[in-house]
């Protein structure tokens, strides 16, 4: 989604990304019903710190359905599981959950994931150990 409501990193500098949040909202509301589950496979927010993502989560909370987020390579705000859950609870973001060292069960399926990327010519051992 690459949202940036809480930070100054607009996506409209890239061709094809003009009004992307408005288009996301309109298409989401057209397609997703309140009982649906949407899996967001990373790159949710450009915020660098969890606090900078609050407006992005407000945008997401106001869309229908349950949302499950996985960590993307641009989700630098991603913190510990405890801090992420406290953030959701403290802000009453009730329709959002994380897959983080666990899985989420929805509609009879277990959803799990991890950050992935294509290897360059030489894999980076530091990233491999961390991820």
PLM regions and their residue ranges:
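Core catalytic region of metal-dependent phosphoesterases/phosphodiesterases
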Residues: 5-106
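Binuclear metal-dependent hydrolase catalytic cores centered on His/Asp/Glu-rich metal-binding motifs
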Residues: 107-131
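Metal-dependent nucleic-acid phosphoesterase active-site entry motif
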Residues: 1-3
